[in-house]
Amino acid sequence: MIRFTLFGVPVCIHPTLWLTLAILGRIFAVTSMVDLICVLLFIISAFVVLLTHEMGHALVGRRLGGGQPSVYLAWLGGDCTNETARLTRRQGVMMTAAGPLCSLAVGVVAYVALSLYVGSFVLGGEMTCLFALGILPAEVVMSFPPLAIFFFFYLIKISCWWTALNLLPIFPLDGGQIMQGLMKSRMQMHLISLTVAVVMVLASASLGCWLLTIFMVLLAVLNHKFYRELRHGGTDFH
């Protein structure tokens, strides 16, 4: 376990986070030192995005409702807790939305930095700031230190994917928690979450994204469980 404090917020990192990120970075496909460096850059980039995401929850929650937040990172994601905070429903939605906004901000900053870094060079009269769009000439790519470019690219890619995933209206993802804060009926919220999760299972399976498929299956099962409990006597409205 790695423990430290950032901006007054205790942070705990479980070893499973590094294991998961290494697998996603294709550590088992490494055949050279360059491959290994790319995997390490992927892990660092993903860690920056995940930590920034959870710190967004923590700092905004503390600002709005006080208390002492803490951040725990494990597997593929994290959890921000602040049991002593006093938040209204609206403030809870704002705190939840702060996570995806902060992780997206990482990608925006990386995109601007990459554009300024690469776009300050001209080759044949063509500005090269279009690298992030995937149309940078190969000759230009070879003329820059590749580590910096890979790092920026990973930050942009992971930031976009992580933000999009978390904003899906599936409980307990951020999108689902925002939906919970805006809706009165928990049963309806879980039904919507279940429906979206099933759609995502079918979509990700058709694309061959098996890790995402498994993740969505778990979320579908979880929301189906909550929905059945509420339907058979649970407290629906909150």
Residue ranges and their predicted role:
Residues 1-238:
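Hydrophobic transmembrane alpha-helices and their immediate loop junctions
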